[in-house]
Amino acid sequence: MNQKIYFDNGSTSWPKAPQVASSMSELLESGAFNINRGNYEGAYELESLVLLTRMQLARLFHAPDSRHVIFTPGITYSLNYLIKGLLRPGDHVLVSSLEHNAVMRPLCQLASQDIHYTMIPAETDGTTQPESVEALIRPETKAVIMLHASNVCGTILPIREIGDICRRHHLFFAVDTAQSAGSVDIDMQECNIDFLAFTGHKGLLGPQGIGGFLISEALDHELTPLIAGGTGSQSDSLLMPDYLPDKYESGTINLPGIIGLHAALTYLEEAGIPAIHQKKMELTGYFLKRIQEIPQAHIAGKQTIQDRLAVVSLDFPEYDNAEIAFSLEQDYGIMTRV
């Protein structure tokens, strides 16, 4: 079929926001300079765009200081930075039972270093009760790490209430916003978030290969930088700068990715995230209603749009899901993920 319908936005959004591709192409063709190194106008202009992108992200997540916006190659890198830069032998963390491998695999790697985790139980639809968190806190618990919304069933977790619990117990609170950023409002200060990890290529409608994290001042004092190298600042010293964002951004950052993300964020600011989210949920509600007319289909998670995002997973227990996905593309041009 010539017409294609893309249903894999939970993995990577497409199409991208307008001007993302053209802004990246223009940079690469007309002046792919570096920042913090060159003493010429093009480098200064590019540095201003990077600063503007930090400010856009600080506004998006209600962070008080754009210097606390750190760019990384993606959210997996960001979460590894947190887990491996914060935890020490004897530490314990709480994680949701819905976590992505970007959290679980690093934690499993650290098990041999006497670093342990406990999973917070969830109901069959992904619902997580805040009181379940409080009951699992130990004297050696250092942080709570959880996604904001499941990448499988779309269920939204109560991060505001859990953030309050973390504050009362003096725990660091880290939130993975891979699925929720660009869809719902996330207030880093109101939710008491110390570490907010984001990626550009999903709900933010930007390119792959660019992500990052926002960090609180309290956590910044505890987090160990994992990478050392050139920053374009204090180059006469063999010691890493101890100020943000340079402290966590060694090497050449992904400038084409940042410029593409800037274009995407500009689009989101103009279109309005609430309006975009409303449209997504209208379509999701219609999809859920119609899919329930198919008796062989099982919906993972919540059956309505209440407390969920536009991420829907289906199971057909009587059939091979891979064969269904193959048929959907070959016969109907519908691209899905199994």
Where are the model-predicted features located?
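Pyridoxal 5′-phosphate
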Residues: 1-338
